[in-house]
A protein has these predicted regions:
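An N-terminal-biased, well-structured beta-alpha scaffold segment characteristic
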Residues: 1-85, 188, 208
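C-terminal helix-to-coil terminal segments
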Residues: 3, 78, 85-98, 112, ...
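Phosphate-coordination loops involved in phosphoryl transfer and adenosine-cofactor binding
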Residues: 6, 59, 136-139, 218
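Redox-cofactor binding/interface segments in oxidoreductases and associated redox assembly factors
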Residues: 11, 41-42, 64, 194-195, ...
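Rossmann-like adenosine-cofactor binding region
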Residues: 48-50, 164, 168-262
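A short helix->loop->beta-strand "cap" motif at the edges of active sites that frequently abuts
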Residues: 56-61, 80-82, 161, 217-219, ...
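Phosphate-binding beta-alpha-beta segment of Rossmann-like dinucleotide-binding domains, i.e.
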Residues: 88-139, 151
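Glycine-rich Rossmann-fold phosphate-binding loop(s) that bind the pyrophosphate
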Residues: 145-146
Length: 307
């Protein structure tokens, strides 16, 4: 492809250098929206709304380096006849590994021996860090049973845990061997609930105080999906009134978490900086959405088409 015929692409958000170099050999990269742009590549920071789309009249493709597309106006894209592509399988294993690690942190606490540790510290550490139950003795509910939820369920089953799930889709859409429950029943049945729902607007505030109360005074809530899925005020009330309850939150309604966020003051809330998908290999795999972008621009069918 000659320079004269290369498509113009805007990298709205940064992608790995290997992916950018590959794309730069096949296209002309620009720093912002313009009338010449035929494709835009985004991660999570850039909101692709109607106003932005109007700045790019020649646009043909939106590439999402990642999975969720709730920050992309799919209706507007469809009306314009734009193709939206993403990388739905790029970070599944990274998120599942991270969720398992956080669950093990919660049920099997551990610590290193300090270099200057005494006999008394050794004994007190053994007493304080003794886990209550093995992971296999917990009932674990998975809220949202897509790629990540299903993979997590399979891994937890191998470890011996009893698994149930809730999803908007009918049970017939999912593999056998997992129990489907209503949203209310899932929280009432579970010792631990791990949240893996998508970014559709209907999921905002999905986890209410009533559901948290049914999870119980010693329940554990893990969220690696979207921060706004949980009603924050209800979560604070639940944690304040149930000291044995715990929340592990990798995602937050506002990121970075504000210094004034009340959840910072809860000893039974663990706040993490949105790390679930952050392995170098997963980030690079997400960056390779540029291959599907080029497929669209050269008239081929992409591997992962959203609309």
């Amino acid at each position: 492809m000659s320079v004269a015929t290369q498509p113009t692409i805007w990298l709205a958000d940064p992608i790995p250098s290997t992916c950018k170099a590959w794309l730069s050999e096949r296209s002309t990269l620009v720093d912002g929206p313009s009338s010449d742009v035929e494709a835009v590549v985004v991660r999570t920071a850039t909101q692709v709304d109607r106003a932005l789309l109007e700045l790019m009249p020649q646009l043909r493709c939106v590439g999402r380096a990642g999975v969720g597309v709730d920050h992309i106006d799919l209706k507007a894209c469809t009306e314009r006849g734009l193709v939206v592509v993403n990388t739905p399988e790029a970070n599944t294993e990274s998120v599942v590994e991270y969720a398992i690690a956080l669950l093990l942190d919660a049920v099997r606490p551990r610590a290193d021996i300090p270099n200057d540790s005494s006999h008394e510290l050794w004994e007190s550490s053994r007493r304080q860090l003794t886990g209550g139950r093995r992971l296999a003795e917990y009932r674990i509910g998975i809220l949202g049973f897509g790629r990540i939820g299903q993979r997590l369920g399979k891994v937890l089953q191998v470890l011996g845990a009893e698994i149930a799930f809730h999803d908007l889709k009918d049970e017939s859409h999912f593999p056998r061997g997992f129990s489907s429950r209503s949203l209310e029943d899932l929280f009432a049945w579970s010792d631990i609930v791990s949240v893996h729902v998508d970014g559709r607007s209907e999921n905002r505030g999905l986890v209410t105080g009533e559901l948290l109360e049914s999870l119980g005074p010693s329940g554990l809530l893990l969220n690696t999906s979207r921060g706004w899925v949980i009603n924050t005020r209800d979560l604070q009330h639940w944690l304040a009134h149930h000291p044995q309850a715990r929340a592990i939150l990798d995602v937050h309604e506002e990121e970075p978490v504000p210094m004034a966020d009340p959840l910072r003051n809860f000893s039974n809330a663990r706040l993490l900086p949105h790390l679930a998908s952050r392995t170098e290999s997963a980030v690079e795999a997400m960056g390779w959405v540029v291959r599907d972008v080029m497929a669209v621009l050269t008239g081929s069918e992409p591997n992962h088409r959203v609309c």
